[in-house]
Amino acid sequence: SKSVMAVECDHALTQAESDKLCWLFGEATPESEENLKGHFVGPRREMITPWSTNAVEITQNMGLDGIIRIEEYFPVKDENADHDPMLQRMYKGLDQNVFTTNRQPEPIVHIEDLEAYNEKEGLALSKEEMDYLKKVEKDLGRPLTDSEVFGFAQINSEHCRHKIFGGTFIIDGVEQESSLFQMIKKTTQENPNKIISAYKDNVAFAEGPVIEQFAPADHSKPDYFQVKDIKSVISLKAETHNFPTTVEPFNGASTGTGGEIRDRMGGGKGSWPIAGTAVYMTSYPRTEEGRPWEEILPVRKWLYKTPEQILIKASNGASDFGNKFGQPLICGSVLTFEHKEKDEVYGYDKVIMLAGGVGYGTQRDCLKGTPEASNKVVVIGGDNYRIGLGGGSVSSVDTGRYSSGIELNAVQRANAEMQKRAYNVVRALCEEDNNPVVSIHD
């Protein structure tokens, strides 16, 4: 068979319920055996997939009650078949325990050797940062826990803090009066034109026209649509996702697009994405013969994927997320380059993947408010797993420094369906006459 569907329910299915499921699965045949032999690739027991969430919701809309989880498993030739170990696992046979998990939470670990833990987990902490953590340990009178050190590494990484761009530069012994970030911001400060917000939020906003908003009168219930004029702002956003796309092109580019869309959702007190773009830069892909300019350098042994594989898979990943989310990828560009100048060799061996896009919001919601002690903090989205953690710190060092396991784990995995659900909430709040959001962030 092409695939096997496993259904978890809280009661024995009636014949009518079983018939409905078979119809839903494309006239599938019920399996009479409780145990299936062979090798199968499917989702990890511990992780309910976005596909399952959607499938269960469809069964609820069909009037099928009591279905908890539905997952799909694919027969493979042997245990060496290719799969993503972060999201999938190899099953040697399928049985009634396919959804059973016996894992217990790992105990809190106190870190006795910060230097060793820093290298082991790929946290990219500098000597100064570790000296600071040791001072914190001394003040607390105890070693820091693994969660505390890991959390510090993420929020204090170069990816998040922009320590280089925001730092003080001393050139030839002379301290420079401006940081790189201050120099970048100077253009907008001296010539703001119609810029409303830049370099201080998830996205930049420029003044837009008065437009018609076509939206339900009340999002909390089924209601009639209405038209009203709103003063708009135009959002612009671009960011690179180089390290993840180098390591795992499909998910790297997919989550680059997804993260950039979230940034346009998280501007001010909420805003709307419209369309996206993508840029790819790699070394020569060597897809065809007869291109003498591509022979300027010998073919290297690539650490992860070849430039050809990266261009194909990254393009597929970026488009895949946009398609599933509902945002078209309308333009982009590709640059491939290698060069040798005397003994110097140049090339985009570490890939550039830039995701960008435009959107819009309301002038009412384009600036964040100041949170107060009495405000509520609300988190929406999917289940949390240890996926993509470490990306901010691992991407701050040279690709290939850490083990492939650490680097592959640091790449996020896309969940466009869940992101669209979160976006529906953000959009509903922004389209209401009174938006309760004070500040929003992804």
Cite the ranges covered by each PLM segment.
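Core nucleic-acid recognition elements
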Residues: 1-399, 404-437
